A protein has these predicted regions:
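N-terminal topogenic module of multi-pass integral membrane proteins
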Residues: 1-63, 67, 202
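Interfacial loop-to-helix junctions that mark the boundaries of transmembrane helices
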Residues: 12-17, 41-48, 101-108, 159-165
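Mid-membrane cores of alpha-helical transmembrane segments in multi-pass membrane proteins
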Residues: 21-31, 50-62, 75-92, 107-120, ...
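A structural feature that tracks compact, well-ordered secondary-structure segments
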Residues: 33, 37, 63-69, 75-78, ...
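Membrane-helix interface "capping/anchor" motifs
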Residues: 66-74, 125-136
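Transmembrane alpha-helix boundary signature
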Residues: 92-100
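Alpha-helical membrane segments in multi-pass integral membrane proteins
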Residues: 109-122, 132-155, 159-183
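Short, highly charged, low-complexity non-transmembrane loops/tails of multi-pass membrane proteins
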Residues: 190-204
């Protein structure tokens, strides 16, 4: 009989935090994008604020910390950054709505969203080494940020406000993230690849 001390220790199986972060990001993005696209009235924003604090913010921060522990630099940077984005958004809407801060000029919001678009574009370039599903999320997201920024600058494309177009791109982004989260949970639960998320565009 083998000595138990001599038996190799097996590392406990650790869950993938990615689906949690994607779900928090995707669900919150869909709800806010319904407002940006005009599918919900502006009065619906107070519904988004606690959702952004809790699921959009905290869930992604948890995912970011777990990605850090797993040694995934890309996942850590992405989830932590967008989790803090939702905290920034929620805190801004909360303080302005409570009258603690004055409403910022549209140009300030535009520049902020534009910088988030630039940041997301850079992460999109990095995501060429990830699977095609994650790559598509970042593609749609930087387009969303740019359209929202142009909307705050007051630009239009024909009869369409750029902010409204950004809302529809945001809907696609959020739904894409939710789908990827679902697929990752499904594959993990089945312990096999039920649905493929696509191979990386750049594999070298």
């Amino acid at each position: 009989m083998a000595n138990p001390i001599d038996q190799p220790l097996t590392a406990p199986k650790v869950a993938n935090p990615g689906p949690l972060g994607l779900a928090g990001f995707g669900l919150t993005t869909v709800v806010l994008s319904c407002v940006n696209a005009g599918l919900l009235p502006a009065e619906a924003v107070p519904v988004v604020v606690p959702l952004a604090f809790a699921y959009g913010g905290v869930a992604q921060l948890i995912a970011g910390v777990l990605e850090f522990k797993a040694g995934n630099t890309f996942g850590m940077v992405a989830f932590t950054s967008y989790g803090l984005f939702w905290w920034w958004f929620a805190f801004l809407k909360w303080t302005v709505g409570a009258g603690w801060l004055s409403t910022p000029p549209a140009s300030a919001m535009a520049v902020t969203l534009l910088m988030w678009g630039v940041f997301t574009f850079l992460l999109w370039i990095v995501s060429f080494r990830s699977n095609k599903a994650v790559w598509s999320i970042f593609l749609l997201l930087w387009i969303t940020f740019f359209f929202l920024a142009w909307g705050d600058f007051g630009y239009m494309i024909g009869p369409w406000r750029c902010g409204t177009i950004g809302g529809y791109f945001g809907l696609l982004t959020g739904l894409d993230a939710l789908f990827v989260a679902f697929v990752e949970v499904l594959n993990a639960t089945a312990d096999r690849e039920v649905i493929s998320l696509g191979r990386p565009i750049i594999r070298a």
